[in-house]
């Protein structure tokens, strides 16, 4: 240190420096080939299996049981010879002492903030189900190309050892007869929720072929977490009591026979029939699951998006507060119309002919072309609809990459909610063109909308409970760790990626991700490879630290001094995860200097995000704990130093990121 140098040590005793303190608490249709190929990036090629279901279901609303006949055309597009196949039998989880039951009760023994860690919707309820309340799926017969096949139950998985292997690049036909009992509503699928009073929420209701991909079979037992399915086409016919009204995946093919707002004439009621049961015929193409719901008292709202957009269906039951309830569900339909142009602008076109928001016994829970909702809350409504992009159209293996499903959905939901709030405000202020302005804007969206996700991440990072994002969804030690990892840390991943590569580049990435990987089951490496291509930066380090470890980010302002006619700011990395740094200096005259310090592992720096002049400095080597920034102004003119003024970097100790100097 030079003699007469002005030196300020941050944190030193009797320092005249004060800090800003930031307090954070824990809290359809296939797209055309041209659509995917008309871009400047190389197209991914990966084989995928393909299914075509034809199912005929007869539902007994007295016994709550159904019988079904299923024909499954299965195309083995892999280079492998398949000696066996697997089916999911999800209803079998709803039996006392099932894996789901025991797992829930074991999690309930662990207390976080004096509360059991189990899902409050599940708790120990499965243990107490009576014989006529449990769920089950039983296979009566199973044939492949007309030949009976031996099978073995593994609770929620059916193993079929084939009498003749399925050769590569061949197609076989499985025919099955099965019966099932719909469980009392516990989680997702079921009947007779006493709160919503919806009779049937029919998700995970049929024997579903397990996905086989480049990593092999994925016969994941059902313990209430995530899903993964084979893309294909569903043709489903349901016979049920004639007074019941249905909604679900796909298009209603016999709408003219049904009426009730589905038909062209918009008939308000079900068309009268003399038979005791009515047949509903749905077809959903290029989806990886099929959901339906049924209740005799459903109301039905519809909206038609302009420019050949999808039909929006809203099915709901009235509560005692009829007027308020109907207004709330009407807002669901209207909100969907308002936000879809914004969604498609930023995340890609919705390709299916309809979407149904359905009052169900549990939810929100997302499915292709439909979601189940326990109520009309718009936050949940938007979240579940955004799952149409991050899962229903991209189809990652949720068990392995829950953060790419829930996290990206959470990220998108925050932006769509903010847009909707602005739209409502604009309408109240009489600006009829404001929505279009916002939709077409290229503004940098900073994490004000994402603040709760940052708070939740900080909580889990400091709790000692955090586990890496690479943990299989079923195998997190706590529900808290799973939930925050998949939702909050996944959302922060995407916002923070915008900090690293620049928000406009991140937004371009999201559209390219949709264009290149829709209907192709991308994994995290596929995403990062594309991110590197779009940004021109190396990002493997980001995935390694953020996804594969629980190392945290913590940067601090260490010291200030003058030396040889220049002022100096020393920054220090205290956390174990290195990052690029945005730095802002504010002076007494109101001027500011903005710097970006790339991480050497990036082999480049992000482009300017706004018209604000930014100086790109030499890269900070990850091996070096400190970095010095020099500037010409006198140190006595400096008022404030800020690391990451946009607050997009998930620094677990924000208080040492800002230094305000009181001279």
Model-derived segments and spans:
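N-terminal, polar/Ser/Thr-rich
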Residues: 40-67, 96, 539-541
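Short, hydrophobic/aromatic-enriched beta-strand segments in well-ordered soluble domains
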Residues: 70-72, 89, 170-184, 234-242, ...
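A surface-exposed beta-strand-loop module
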Residues: 75, 115-195, 619-636, 646-647, ...
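Hydrophobic helix-coil surface modules that form long, contiguous segments used
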Residues: 209-216, 224-382, 411-414, 423
């Amino acid at each position: 240190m030079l003699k007469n140098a002005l030196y300020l040590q941050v944190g030193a005793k009797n320092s005249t420096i004060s800090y800003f303190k930031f307090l954070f608490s824990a809290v359809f249709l296939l797209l055309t080939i041209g659509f995917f190929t008309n871009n400047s990036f190389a197209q991914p090629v990966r084989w995928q299996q393909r299914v075509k279901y034809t199912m005929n279901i007869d539902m007994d609303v007295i016994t709550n049981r159904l019988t079904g006949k299923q024909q499954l055309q299965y195309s083995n597009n892999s280079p492998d010879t398949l000696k066996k196949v697997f089916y999911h039998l999800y209803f079998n989880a709803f039996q006392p002492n099932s894996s789901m039951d025991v797992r829930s009760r074991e999690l309930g023994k662990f207390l976080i903030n004096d509360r059991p860690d189990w899902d409050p919707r599940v708790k120990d309820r499965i243990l107490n189900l009576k014989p006529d309340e449990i769920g089950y799926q039983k296979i009566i017969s199973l044939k492949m190309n007309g030949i009976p096949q031996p099978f073995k139950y593994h609770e929620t998985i059916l193993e079929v050892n084939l009498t003749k292997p399925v050769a590569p690049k061949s197609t076989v036909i499985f025919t099955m007869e099965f019966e099932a009992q719909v469980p009392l509503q516990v989680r997702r699928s079921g009947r007779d929720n006493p709160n919503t009073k919806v009779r049937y929420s029919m998700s995970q209701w049929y024997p579903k072929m397990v996905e086989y991909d480049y990593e092999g079979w994925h016969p994941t037992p059902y313990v209430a977490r995530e899903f993964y399915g084979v893309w294909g086409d569903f043709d489903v016919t349901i016979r049920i009591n004639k007074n019941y009204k249905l909604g679900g995946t796909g298009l209603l093919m016999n709408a003219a026979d049904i009426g009730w707002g589905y038909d062209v004439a918009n008939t308000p009621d079900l068309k009268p029939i003399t038979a005791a049961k009515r047949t509903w015929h749905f077809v959903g193409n290029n989806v990886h699951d099929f959901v339906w719901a049924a209740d005799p008292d459903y109301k039905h709202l519809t909206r038609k998006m302009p420019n050949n957009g999808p039909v929006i269906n809203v099915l709901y039951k009235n509560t005692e507060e009829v007027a308020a309830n109907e207004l709330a569900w009407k807002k669901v339909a209207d909100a969907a119309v308002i936000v879809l142009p914004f969604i498609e602008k930023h995340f890609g076109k919705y390709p299916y002919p309809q979407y149904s928001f359905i009052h169900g016994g549990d939810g929100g829970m997302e499915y292709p072309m439909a979601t189940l909702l326990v109520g009309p809350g718009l936050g949940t409504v938007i979240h579940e609809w955004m799952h149409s992009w991050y899962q229903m159209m991209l189809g990652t293996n949720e068990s392995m990459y829950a953060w790419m499903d829930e996290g990206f959905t959470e990220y998108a939901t925050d932006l769509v909610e903010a847009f909707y709030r602005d739209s409502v405000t604009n309408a109240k202020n009489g600006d009829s063109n404001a929505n279009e302005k916002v939709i077409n804007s290229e503004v940098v969206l900073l994490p004000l909308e994402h603040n709760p996700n940052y708070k939740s991440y900080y909580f889990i990072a400091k709790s000692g409970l955090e586990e890496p994002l690479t943990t299989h969804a079923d195998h997190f030690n706590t529900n808290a760790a799973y939930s925050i990892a998949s939702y909050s840390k996944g959302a922060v991943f995407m916002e923070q990626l915008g900090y690293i590569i620049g928000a406009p580049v991140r937004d371009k990435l999201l559209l390219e991700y949709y264009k290149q990987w829709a209907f192709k089951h991308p994994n995290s490496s596929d995403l990062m490879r594309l991110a590197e291509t779009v940004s021109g930066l190396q990002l493997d380090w980001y995935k390694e630290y953020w996804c594969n470890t629980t190392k945290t980010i913590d940067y601090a302002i260490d010291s200030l001094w003058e030396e040889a006619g220049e002022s100096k700011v020393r920054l220090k990395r205290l956390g174990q995860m290195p990052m690029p740094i945005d730095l802002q200096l504010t002076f007494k005259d109101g001027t500011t200097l903005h710097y970006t310090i790339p991480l050497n592992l990036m082999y480049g720096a992000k482009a300017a995000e706004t018209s604000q002049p930014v100086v790109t400095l030499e890269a900070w080597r990850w091996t070096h704990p400190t970095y010095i920034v020099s500037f010409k102004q006198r140190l006595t003119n400096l008022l404030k130093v800020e690391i990451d003024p946009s607050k997009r970097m998930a620094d677990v100790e924000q208080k040492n990121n800002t230094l305000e100097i009181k001279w």
